[in-house]
Curated annotation (Swiss-Prot):
GO cellular component assignments: chloroplast thylakoid membrane
Subcellular location: Plastid, Chloroplast thylakoid membrane
Descriptive protein name: NAD(P)H-quinone oxidoreductase subunit I, chloroplastic
Keyword Cell wall biogenesis/degradation: no
Subunit relationships: NDH is composed of at least 16 different subunits, 5 of which are encoded in the nucleus.
Species assigned in the record: Nicotiana tomentosiformis
GO biological process: photosynthesis, light reaction
Length: 167
């Protein structure tokens, strides 16, 4: 008779513990009910990226000194830097610079360690293509500004500014 009573007490304790766990889970579920949804309707709504978002790399050809620091700090040796030594001025002349975004892990080391700041991360994240070879960007494609910057009305070129007349 005594083992039957202890089994009944254990069963009751397990039932109370299970009900408490179910209640805790239910309270967590209810606490999420008053939050706004995180889901966005992608083609029609765009994500607002954070200030330090690491998207596509922007490259400024004129600033690059072909030092290859970006290649040395890259964990996968990704940037391809082609240069030619100008013997008369004893400096390197950059011929070609390319990055394959199909392989890039967007770690940002190349941007952080570049001595001339010719590399920067943009907020552009839409890099999908049907052919993986289209993800290999040369210096011309890397030099293009992202669409969010091009369409931003607050950024104007000097040619678009109103002319000031000096009279």
């Amino acid at each position: 008779m005594l083992p039957m009573i202890t089994e009944f007490i254990n069963y009751g304790q397990q039932t109370i513990r299970a009900a408490r766990y179910i209640g805790q889970g239910f309270m967590i579920t209810l606490s999420h009910a008053n939050r706004l949804p995180v889901t966005i309707q992608y083609p029609y709504e765009k994500l607002i990226t954070s200030e330090r978002f690491r998207g596509r790399i922007h490259f400024e050809f004129d600033k690059c000194i072909a030092c290859e620091v970006c290649v040395r700090v890259c964990p996968i040796d990704l940037p391809v830097v082609d240069w030619k030594l100008e013997t008369d001025i004893r400096k390197k002349r950059l011929l070609n610079y390319s990055i394959d975004f199909g392989i890039c892990i967007f770690c940002g080391n190349c941007v952080e360690y570049c001595p001339t700041n010719c590399l920067s991360m943009t907020e552009e994240y839409e890099l999908s293509t049907y052919d993986r070879h289209e993800l290999n960007y040369n210096q011309i494609a890397l030099g293009r500004l992202p669409m969010s910057v091009i369409n931003d009305y607050t950024i104007r070129t000097i040619s678009n500014l109103p002319q000031i007349k000096n009279e």
